[in-house]
Amino acid sequence: MKHKLRSAMLLCVGLLAIAAISIGTSKAANPDETVDIIGGYQLKTYSKIYASGISAESGTTHGGGGSCNVSATFYALDTDDNVIYTVTGSDTYNYYAIVNHSVKDAAHDYFYKAESVHHITYNGNNHTYYQTADYP
């Protein structure tokens, strides 16, 4: 009985060790795998995000503690072009789909039909938006 219990415990510990190694390896091997979006969604870098109707001028920065005063609609799409998340509104930094550009600064790798780039600085954080002229 003791032998079976010990074997089961060793097997369990071994499986946990293998799982921990594979999780650590996959994270290290794919540091750019996901893009964080406020709202709790994580998109693969090959997914598409549409941002239309951004009201700030290209290159405009807003510093300090105030609102960015950006109005936009963001469409997060899966790889089959199905909309999985849509948000519309202003003060995008606080409420809506912000791309964490530090994950992968070449944002056009996962933005679709990017026609203009917007850099918004809010509380010292620089965020990059790609605006699309139309929703497909």
Regions found by a protein language model. Give the residues of each.
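Mature secreted bioactive peptide module from preproproteins
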Residues: 29-136
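N-terminal prepro-regions of secreted/extracellular proteins
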Residues: 1-51
